[in-house]
A protein has these predicted regions:
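Solvent-exposed loop/turn segments at secondary-structure junctions
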Residues: 51-56, 86-90, 127-132, 142-145, ...
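N-terminal, active-site-proximal structural segment of metallo-dependent hydrolase catalytic domains
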Residues: 2, 16-135, 180, 329-331, ...
């Protein structure tokens, strides 16, 4: 009994000492609140990708193409994803598109949400121009809500502007929305720039009419540009209306390359930014797209001046712009020719199979 009594007293005093010590520790090391602002810092990944007639099965069964895109999305994890040159989804009897009805949902199920379950939704799409191809915008519905869209141009193809808003944790109480406008396009291809110059110039004129000042805005897609002195490119970065000039991040912000630029004539000077082609040989893995390896920089993401301001709610993260899968050594090589350490080999193979185009991506910071 003496042993048990002594043991009990020892445990009692240990318990008291622990209880006394606990408040002291809390006072010595103040606990920071888990959340100091309703808007936590965040990073938004923005990606534009020409998917080469995705939907018409020219490159292979849609289920197979879904699996390639699933691999790419699982790696890149975009929060805003623009797919351009999707085979048009028929919405009427006179539409030219050959994608199956409901193909946008099929992309969600078989590719995007298969990679990241429950994450993605898509915006409304149009094809008033009755083109064979169209653009689809997807977004991370855990970070953004869809507000509205407008068709800005319907010439050869539709160019739509989408209005998204950031999902503030306190949005239901404050009703304070931070909008982000995304213009997604695929201009006319070909060596003669007249059609694409007209499309982009009309787009810029429409933007000027819409907004008394440029909001948080991105213009992205496949511009089919050969050089920076084309009228369409100049309409974006050097518009006659000085308050409506956009930035091409590798040039204007990161200063990695300089104007004037002609990647058609000197691709080696822009090797890490080239987006056409992922394939060295024309008929491999299929004959649905161009070969010739990396030679053209058709795909861009332009940002409004507000997004270049580090104090803005949305702001470009310097040097985040990059071409996924392009390590700068693709001038005479396919994307999956080794060595290429810019992405895992499985992703490189998926890029090779999915399209003859490389995707481009940048990151936006989100600050309280």
């Amino acid at each position: 009994m003496t042993f048990l009594r002594a043991r009990s007293l020892l445990l009692f005093f240990l318990l008291i000492s622990q209880c006394d010590a606990s408040p002291t520790k809390v006072e010595e090391v103040p606990v920071e609140p888990a959340q100091t602002d309703p808007r936590q810092k965040d990073i938004i990944k923005v990606m534009s990708y020409n998917v080469l007639k995705y939907g018409d099965e020219c490159q292979g069964p849609n289920a197979t193409m879904h699996s390639y895109l699933k691999t790419i999305i699982g790696y890149a994890e975009p929060d805003i994803l623009g797919l351009v040159k999707v085979e048009a989804i028929p919405q009427s009897e006179i539409d030219k598109g050959q994608s199956p009805i409901g193909f946008a949902d099929s992309i969600l199920i078989g590719a995007l949400n298969a990679a990241k379950p429950g994450r993605y939704a898509y915006c409304p799409f149009t094809n008033a121009a009755r083109d064979k191809d169209e653009c689809l915008l997807f977004y991370n519905k855990h970070k953004f809500g869809f507000a509205s869209f407008s068709t800005m141009v319907s010439d050869i193809s539709d160019i739509n502007m989408y209005k998204l808003y950031y999902l503030d944790l306190n949005l239901a109480k404050t009703h304070d929305t931070s909008f982000l406008y995304v213009v997604l396009l695929h201009t006319a291809s070909g060596d003669v720039p007249d059609d694409r110059n007209r499309q982009v110039t009309e787009l810029m004129n429409t933007i000027i009419k819409y907004f008394p000042a440029l909001p948080n805005m991105i213009i992205m897609g496949d511009f089919n540009l050969r050089k920076t002195n084309e009228d369409g490119y100049q309409a974006i970065i050097s518009n006659a209306e000085k308050n409506y000039r956009f930035f091409d991040p590798p040039f204007a912000i990161d200063k990695k390359v300089s104007y004037p630029a002609n990647w058609d004539k000197h691709p080696e000077q822009y090797s890490s930014y080239l987006t056409t082609s992922t394939r060295k040989k024309w008929k491999e893995p299929n004959d649905c797209g161009t070969g010739g390896a990396a030679k053209g920089w058709y795909d861009h993401i332009f940002i409004a001046p507000k997004l270049a301001d580090k104090n803005n709610f949305y702001h470009y993260i310097p040097s985040s712009y990059h071409t996924i899968g392009n390590d700068g050594n693709r001038l005479d090589a396919s994307v999956n020719d080794l060595p290429n350490k810019s992405a895992p080999s499985k992703v490189l193979e998926a890029l090779y199979q999915m399209s003859n185009k490389y995707p481009v991506m940048l990151e936006l910071g989100v600050s309280p």
